[in-house]
């Protein structure tokens, strides 16, 4: 089915990104014979449209930076794929799909080193700018702690549309695969993420970010919980 034929309210919703579509179709090709692939893809498309038919209409559409590649709507598209293809896909595959959407941008920023005060302050400013976008759309409700020299950066979300969507549709089992990319993205900036909760398994999604050489890390070893979330003690 051509994307333009999907029944979406395009005044408030956006289509999955082209990279996301490519990822989903590539995974379908891995699991299904050629004769079935187009049918499966149409099922994913219809599931996506069905999910959005009674979903929030206040997320800003194309104007909201959270709705780009790897963002809220791509997460919904991946959950559509998961819903249709649950019998053949896996947790790691879903995790890989989100990584393939998010990490290319961070790989281009490998020169950033969170261990250095200059880059740490620039990262902090980037998070403050992101909060401005969140305040405009009230999608990911974000709080950023004041900057303190020689201390980790801290911010948190108390609202997450992707998590809200997963809870509503009984898809929380796959949310760890979509959230864990936050760890991988920070690692590409010579940084480490320390997280104890997300909006799916708690009341907030917390981000403590420090350089990968910071002694603070020793106090908060990473582990995977039973659900598959990467977390810290």
Model regions and ranges:
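Short, cationic low-complexity segments
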Residues: 184, 222-233
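Short, hydrophobic/π-rich interface segment
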Residues: 142-201
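Short, charged/polar, Gly/Pro-enriched secondary-structure boundary elements
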Residues: 162-164, 212-219
């Amino acid at each position: 089915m051509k994307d333009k034929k999907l029944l979406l309210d395009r005044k408030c919703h956006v289509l999955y990104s082209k990279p996301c579509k490519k990822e989903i179709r590539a995974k379908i090709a891995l699991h299904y014979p050629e004769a079935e692939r187009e049918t499966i893809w149409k099922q994913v498309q219809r599931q996506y449209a069905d999910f959005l038919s009674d979903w929030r209409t206040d997320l800003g559409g194309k104007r909201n930076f959270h709705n780009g590649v790897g963002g809220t709507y791509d997460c919904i598209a991946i959950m559509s794929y998961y819903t249709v293809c649950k019998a053949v896909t896996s947790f790691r595959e879903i995790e890989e799909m989100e990584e393939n959407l998010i990490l290319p941008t961070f790989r281009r920023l490998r020169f950033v080193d969170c261990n250095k005060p200059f880059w740490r302050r620039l990262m902090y400013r980037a998070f403050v700018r992101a909060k401005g976008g969140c305040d405009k759309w009230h999608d990911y409700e974000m709080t950023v702690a004041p900057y303190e020299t020689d201390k980790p950066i801290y911010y948190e979300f108390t609202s997450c549309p992707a998590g809200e969507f997963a809870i509503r549709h009984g898809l929380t089992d796959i949310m760890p695969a979509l959230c864990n990319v936050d760890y991988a993205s920070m690692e590409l900036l010579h940084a480490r993420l320390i997280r104890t909760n997300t909006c799916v398994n708690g009341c907030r999604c917390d981000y403590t970010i420090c350089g990968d050489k910071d002694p603070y890390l020793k106090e908060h070893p990473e582990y995977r919980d039973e659900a598959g979330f990467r977390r810290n003690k």
